[in-house]
């Protein structure tokens, strides 16, 4: 079987660098799944913008494809980073760049406008994410782009361009992104994209990354997605 390389784009609301939780998760993940992991270092806002990160990660991806054409490449990310991998894959499809074999998104932020009225019902349940803070961060990150640009808010894109990738999405019921993620997964399926949605009942944002027993089941699902990509 061809070797798999994972490009992991970390979250942090577009304003934070990689943190120890990410690194510990990636250590467990690489060991369980037996894959190589590349973690692009992008400059968060206000030092960098979406356009900068897209340039950097696209360069890494195209170089990897040229040097190792035989490898499977899976894009993976959490939170803001999981929103970004969809934006990147959509952008690559429109540019005619080869699609990643798999996309694995953990608690993805798929609509930077956060305009879905259903979000209000989840604010009390979510101990991690703050809507007002995310609004500010999204505008800083967008730079010259609009926050509703499909590269930043992939829920607004023509998702049929992702048909060449297998998509796996994981989300908890106790996070403000939950209604958007469920809607997004439905839109992917409707657009003809092979999509698996895994819902963590009573789980919080980014729960598969946390060092808790409940993270083992999603890790196994991620491993299966790797094998099937």
Regions picked out by a protein language model, each given a short descriptive name:
Residues 1-229:
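Alpha/beta-hydrolase superfamily serine-hydrolase fold, recognizing
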């Amino acid at each position: 079987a061809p070797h798999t390389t994972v490009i992991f784009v970390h979250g942090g609301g577009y304003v934070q660098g990689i943190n120890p939780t990410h690194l510990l998760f990636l250590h467990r993940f690489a060991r369980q799944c037996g894959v190589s992991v590349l973690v692009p270092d992008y400059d968060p806002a206000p030092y960098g913008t979406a356009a900068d990160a897209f340039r950097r990660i696209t360069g890494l991806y195209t170089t990897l494809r040229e040097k190792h054409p035989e490898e499977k490449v899976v894009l993976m990310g959490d939170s803001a980073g999981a929103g970004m991998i969809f934006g990147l894959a959509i952008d690559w499809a429109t540019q005619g760049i080869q699609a990643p074999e798999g996309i694995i998104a953990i608690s993805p932020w798929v609509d930077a406008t956060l305009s879905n009225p259903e979000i209000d019902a989840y604010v009390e349940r979510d101990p991690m994410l703050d809507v007002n803070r995310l609004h500010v961060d999204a505008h800083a990150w967008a730079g010259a782009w609009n926050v509703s640009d499909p590269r930043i808010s992939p829920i607004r894109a023509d998702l049929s361009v992702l048909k060449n990738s297998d998509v796996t999405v994981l989300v908890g019921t106790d996070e403000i992104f939950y209604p958007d993620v469920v809607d997004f997964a439905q839109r992917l399926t409707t657009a003809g994209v092979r999509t698996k949605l895994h819902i963590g009942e009573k789980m919080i944002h980014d729960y598969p990354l946390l060092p808790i027993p409940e993270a083992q089941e999603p890790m196994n699902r991620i491993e299966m997605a790797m094998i099937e990509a």
